[in-house]
């Protein structure tokens, strides 16, 4: 897993007022506060969560 491709995801907008499924995607990505950045593996399930909340996050590919 050391060679696994990773991506950095940063929460740029608050999920307050969003659909409950979108809030769960933000939580599933491990994001807590605005400006919080996490490094996650680049998998199809992670990409799906990012695509669902693309208006709330910024993505940086490594």
UniProtKB/Swiss-Prot annotation:
Listed GO MF terms? structural constituent of ribosome
Tell me one GO biological process term: translation
Q: Write down any Gene Ontology CC term.
A: cytosolic large ribosomal subunit
Leader sequence range is: none
Matching Pfam families, A to Z?
A: Ribosomal_L30
> Keyword Metal-binding: yes or no?
no
Keywords assigned by UniProt? Ribonucleoprotein, Ribosomal protein
Q: Quaternary state and partners of this protein?
A: Part of the 50S ribosomal subunit.
Q: What HAMAP family has UniProt attached to this entry?
A: Ribosomal_uL30_B
Q: Which protein family is named in the record?
A: Belongs to the universal ribosomal protein uL30 family.
Q: Which PANTHER family match?
A: LARGE RIBOSOMAL SUBUNIT PROTEIN UL30M (PTHR15892:SF2), MITOCHONDRIAL RIBOSOMAL PROTEIN L30 (PTHR15892)
**Name of the protein in its database record:** Large ribosomal subunit protein uL30
Q: Look up and give the organism this protein is from.
A: Marinobacter nauticus (strain ATCC 700491 / DSM 11845 / VT8) (Marinobacter aquaeolei)
- Gene that this polypeptide is encoded by: rpmD
